[in-house]
Structures are given as C-alpha cells and as structure tokens.
C-alpha cells in the first residue's frame, strides 16, 4: 500500500495484503482513504470478484496468481515502490500472512513493524510461552512431539487428556484433545508433517485482551472477551459459538494484558492475546480464577470482534487504527458503555426461535446480523447475531434465548 496524506508534507507509504478477505477488512483501508491516504492492495482474487466496498477503499489493486508465491508478492511490492516511492507500512491483519508481512519488511527495510528475523516468538506457540513467563504468568507444560515415544514420555508426566496443535498454526485448525492412547495412535497415523506441540490439558476457559497500540506500545483502546465455549470444540464437535466482552477498565486482565503488550513487539498494531482463566485449582498453574498464558496473535481479533468493540464503546476501531497509522495517536475520547455478545448459530441445529421471531422480540438489542463465509463457519457458526445491553444478567438471557433448542432445552 502506498499512502499519501493530502495537504501534508508527510508521506506514508502503506501496503495492505489481501484487503478483500475477510469481508469486513475493507474497513481498515476505507478509513485510511477517507483521511486522504492513497491505499494500495495486493491480493490473489480477480478484481471483478472483490466487493465494491473493497474496490472503493483502494486506490490501486495489484493481482498476483497466488499470495503463497512470495516471488510474485515481492514483484508487486517492487512495482509499487517504483511507482510511488519507499514503503513505510505493511499490514494484512491476518495471522496467515504475518510471515509474508514480516518478510516484506525485512527485504525492503520497512521499520514500522516486526521483521522476519524477529517474528518467531509471535508465530511459534512454544516460543510464546517464555514471553508470558517473563511477565509472571504460568503456562501449561508442553513438549514438541517429533515421535510417538516422545509423546508417551510427556503423557507419562502429565497424564491424559492432552491437547495437540501445530506449533506454527492459525486458529483452531488441526487442534485436538486426546483422551487415551488409541486417540494418540490415530493422531500419529493421520497427522501431517508439521511440527506439533503437545500441552497438558487445562481446565479453564479462554479470555482475551485485545486492542490497538501506538509506536511506543501504549494501548489506545482495549477490549476483553470471555469465550463461553471452546473454539476447538466448535470446530471438532460442530457446536454453537458464543462469547461476550467485559468492562475492561480496572480488571485483572487489563493489568496483566498491558504487561504482555510491553513484553512483545506490539508497536503500532492491533493485538489479540489469549489466556486461560482456570475453572478449578491446577497444581503448578494456579488457583481457580487465576490467569494462565496461552497464545498471542499480532493482528485484529477475528469473528467480527472489531465490531464488538465498536458496539461496546460506540466508537470506531478502524478509525482509531487509521489515525494510529497516520498520526500515531487516538483523537477520540473513549468510554466503554455496553456489554456485547457474539452468537453464532448452525444451519443444521433446530432452535426455538427462527430469524423473524428473534428480530421481532429482540430487534432493539441486535447490532449485527450476518451470514458467515463457509471457509470461516467451522469456528464462527453459519449465521451471526451480535447483541448488546448494559448489564451481564440481560446479556446472559439474550445468549440463552438465541441458542435455546426447539425442545426448550438449554444450549449447553
């Protein structure tokens, strides 16, 4: 992306990887363009296939045959540099392309974000743990499994169940809970060639600390979500998806999350940190209610969570992000006013209330109502409602009503 500020002597040259996907990512580009920035994108979709919103958010679009082919991406960046000058900012907001972003920064000496040689601690789950520990957080015991005997030795030490996932992976893809040796044997018989990390099972639920930082790692806006069920289970067991946020100011996760922000290279970016909140005492990890370090994601939270923040603050995180990129500050006075829940329903589950009934009964609370692209539906559900209210009791009621089964039973 090349970005030029209209009416200013300052010139920012900025490039956005895959601006067309996920669908709402055009908002990052549009806020820059609305501020007089010339926004240039690189993607592998045909120009005719990208949304009108994305087209209107870009000043120029360079199509490559595949974003997986770095030579093509390199040539695209070189083309933009030859036409517009030096690139100053590179972003995808997509975990899958973080390595591509970082490689471009290294190859073209772009200093506004993490370079490739410094990326490992943000991509490999095994390396993240040491950073969490450096700020005083406990982490689950783990080992990198390269053979069956190594896995058995680890399980002898921690017991079943265990969780396995790619050490360098995206989301909950290829993440499994193994309960016995038969499942372990099946995993080894069917797994791919990637390096997997095996962790002791933690009886807890995931909570996040998300936000935007300036170039000095100061948090400009923050949010925290509480996962009401496991994304791993959503994917593997085809469950509903539900999570909600909290009032973050003064919470323990704000205090700890801010320390984690300082420990990682979070300069000038969106961040999405994950923790376990222990649901029971766990020897070596902590007491019920304690936070345990899990993973970091150096991008905006997914699943329409940026919009959750918008609805909670009655603000616009895309504008805050764009102002951070251009001016390194936030100009908006922020106050979190509402609690918001994300509710993802499945097409093949029978619910008590159909869409029209939900709109009729709860329309005043519904802030977002959208179908989910098939490629994201395993984790997010097929159709999403985002609802908001002013107190936790009413929010819990809304979640339960939206997911209540046709026979009147609760969703969990």
Feature roles, as predicted:
Residues 80-87, 156-158, 192-193:
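Glycine-rich phosphate-binding loop signature in dinucleotide/nucleotide-binding domains
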Residues 1-12:
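Single conserved hydrophobic/aromatic residue that forms the stacking wall/gate
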Residues 82-123, 136-144:
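A short, GP-enriched loop/loop-strand-helix hinge that lies immediately N-terminal to
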Residues 42-60, 65-67, 125:
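Short, glycine/polar-rich helix-capping loops at beta-to-alpha or helix-loop-helix junctions
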Residues 322-412:
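Peripheral (often C-terminal) accessory segments that flank ATP-dependent C-N-forming ligase machineries
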């Amino acid at each position: 992306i090349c970005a030029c500020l209209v009416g200013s002597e300052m010139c920012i040259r900025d490039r956005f990887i895959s601006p067309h996907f996920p669908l709402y990512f055009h908002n990052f580009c549009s806020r820059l363009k609305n501020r007089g920035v010339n926004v240039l994108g690189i993607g592998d979709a045909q120009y005719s296939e990208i949304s009108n919103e994305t087209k209107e958010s870009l000043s120029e679009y360079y199509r490559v045959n595949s974003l997986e082919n770095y030579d093509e991406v390199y040539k695209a960046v070189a083309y933009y540099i030859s036409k517009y000058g030096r690139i100053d900012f590179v972003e995808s907001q997509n975990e899958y392309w973080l390595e591509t972003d970082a490689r471009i920064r290294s190859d073209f000496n772009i200093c506004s974000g993490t370079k490739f040689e410094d990326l490992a601690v943000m991509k490999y789950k095994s390396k993240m743990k040491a950073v969490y520990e450096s700020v005083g957080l406990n982490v689950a015991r783990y080992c990198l499994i390269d053979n069956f005997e190594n896995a058995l030795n680890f399980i002898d030490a921690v017991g079943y169940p265990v969780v396995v996932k790619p050490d360098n992976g995206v989301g909950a893809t290829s993440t499994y809970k193994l309960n016995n040796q038969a499942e372990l044997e099946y995993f080894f018989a069917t797994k791919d060639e990637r390096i997997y990390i095996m962790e002791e099972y933690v009886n807890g639920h995931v909570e996040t600390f998300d936000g935007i930082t300036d170039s000095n790692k100061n948090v400009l806006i923050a949010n925290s979500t509480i996962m009401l069920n496991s994304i791993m289970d959503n994917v593997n067991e085809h469950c509903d998806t539900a999570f909600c946020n909290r009032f973050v100011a003064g919470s323990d996760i704000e205090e700890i999350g801010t320390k984690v922000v300082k420990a990682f290279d979070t300069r000038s970016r969106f961040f999405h940190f994950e923790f376990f909140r222990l649901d029971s005492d766990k020897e070596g990890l902590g007491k019920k209610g304690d936070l345990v370090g899990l993973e970091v994601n150096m991008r905006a939270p997914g699943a329409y969570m940026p919009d959750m923040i918008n609805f909670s603050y009655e603000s616009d995180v895309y504008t805050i992000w764009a102002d951070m990129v251009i001016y390194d500050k936030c100009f908006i006075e922020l106050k979190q006013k509402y609690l918001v829940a994300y509710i993802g329903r499945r097409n093949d589950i029978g619910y008590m209330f159909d869409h029209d009934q939900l709109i009729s009964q709860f329309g005043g609370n519904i802030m977002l109502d959208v179908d989910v692209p098939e490629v994201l539906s395993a984790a997010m559900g097929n159709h999403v409602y985002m609802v908001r209210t002013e107190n936790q009791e009413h929010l819990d009621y809304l979640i339960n009503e939206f997911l209540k089964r046709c026979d009147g039973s609760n969703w969990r």
